[in-house]
Amino acid sequence: MTEFNYPQPAPIGDWNRLLDGRVAVVTGGGTGIGGSISRLFAQHGAIVEIIDIDPAVANESVSDIEAAGGIARAHVADCRDWEQLQGVATTILSDHPHVQVLVNNVGDYRPLERFRKSSPDSWKAMYDINFFAMVASTKCFIESMIAGGGGSIVNIHSVEGMRGYPGDPIYGAMKAASAKFSTDLALSMGRNGIRVNGIGPDLTQTPQVDYVSTSVGSEHLWEAWAPVGRLGWPEDQARVALFLASDLSAYVTGHNIPVDGGTKAGAGWFYSPAEERFTNRPKGL
């Protein structure tokens, strides 16, 4: 019988330290989804390099990680600014020539504008924060990943880039571009040992999108908004990011995973004559 000597997936060395010794760059890693990703990656042994525009939240994440016995460092930069991002990348790569994990988490929901009231300035703002920052960060670190034999890129975008979104078509378009970038980059980088995947969050509590304070009195409706029957939290996104960053997903690339409690699968956007707007969150059961 002919024996086939095909490469096999590497065994998992320590299930409690899935990123042991790997250098992980997390943009927007100070708070919210990025903060949870930074903490969880450090818990699993990664050396976490946090890039954030807010020094206070970046340093707080580093302090939390170090207090728990992890390794992290904060860098202050606006990822919409190419020169700032290049400067931080130079600092990181001078200490760690090879980055194994890159999480492009920077993004924003604001300014939310209906298309008829939008302007070229608002379009550019959406582009800069939701697409340019992702592409620029990837450009800064991808050569080091190739030189080091590969790695994993995880792009955080939105479920609204994976379905129709009537609220703000420009926002939806930028998130769709991020999802497409993830898929296309995966195809071109696979032979370099780099996997690229995206995460599309929805209904997740963050400082940027505060469902808790804006839904006071409506908590009982969450079970109607998401099939899993609850609000999402940054930790929900971080756990999927850990899967995609680690060898658990060694055969997964080019995919965009909705981490949304089932909202994409279970519901769409419908026009409410009573509210005179599109909604996917009914006000009554």
State the predicted function of each range:
Residues 55-56, 76-87, 120, 235-236:
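The beta1-alpha1 cofactor-binding region of Rossmann-like NAD(H)/NADP(H)-dependent oxidoreductases
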Residues 158:
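Residue(s) in the substrate-gating loop at a strand-loop-helix junction
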Residues 143, 187-188, 250:
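Alpha-helical segment proximal to the catalytic Tyr-Lys
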Residues 113-115, 119-127, 222:
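Substrate-binding pocket helix/loop in short-chain dehydrogenase/reductase
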Residues 190, 195, 252-254:
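Short, small/polar-rich loop/turn modules that mediate ligand/substrate recognition or access, typified
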Residues 23, 30-32:
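Conserved glycine-rich cofactor-binding loop
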Residues 138, 174:
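Active-site helix of classical SDR
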